[in-house]
Amino acid sequence: ALMLGMGAVLPEPEYELPLSGEGEAAVYVVGRISGEGSDRKPAPGDFQLTKTEIRDILACREKYAKFLLVLNVGGVVDLSPVMEVGNILLLSQTGMTIGDSFADVLLGKAYPSGKLASTWAKWEEYCPVGEFAQPDDTRYNEGIYVGYRYFDSVGKEPLFPFGFGLGYTTFEVGRPQVEVAGTQVRVTVPVKNTGAALGKEVVQLYVSLPSGKLDQPYQVLAAFGKTGQLAPGQEEALILTFALERLASFDESTAASVLEAGDYLLRLGTSSRDTRLCGVVRLEGEVMVRQLSHVGGKPDFEDWKPENPSRVQEDLAGVPVFPVKPEAYQPKLIP
């Protein structure tokens, strides 16, 4: 069969589902059609839940002691009307064996251990910039403020932050050890399963760049790693590494990717909103990482910037500082 209208909003079905509360558990599945070549719409049945979905989800939560909301979707859905639901499984659209995978997770033969690759928020909380009406003349006014970079930089609270995700157990992220050798940053951190079930955890390393002449978001994801399967009480040392030059920013005035002098704050955690400061890389001078050239001309618009960026004065007392000389870098010329 050929289905036309990818990304279309289907009409809401009309039905009356008797919810007596009988049985031990209830599962409610929210589905969406995915597509490409068009934006999501702030409408019920697409980005937003329909009245019927909200009604039935809240009814199931009220009448069943064990209730699971399953999201068989390819993108974000505004869950703000049903945030009181305690168990939400993001199944996504993972192919023809999705039913087998879901059954394994539901019956305890497998466990969820993923993390969100996008920020989930109310529709009105997303960055109100961009002109995407014409596919052959698109102005990406949002600049660097895409996804979590926007939410973290302007201080807006999402429903679920970038990198968030729970499983059937809990974890403790221990005290990290930071090492800096030349341009390489290495963070070793112990992760312990403190719950009663098997599981895996993902640890994420973010970096806040110095605020110099170039505009910067509050933080950027520099590295992440996932443990192997950990039994209750089991611990693993996770190693995260990245090269500082990967954080270089483009300077339009010189057509070069540069690292500005200053403090690069290392933040370790399990989501973009759950981090702690674990180290500072102090670059003692500006570094030109790559010399490029202007070949596409200058755009006819200015990138959007927040009026009041979410920047706080960090207390660096007790935080290890690693000085780095600019001479540690070898610039590259890209014609």
Language model features with spans:
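C-terminal non-catalytic regions of proteins with extracellular/luminal or membrane-system context
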Residues: A1-P335
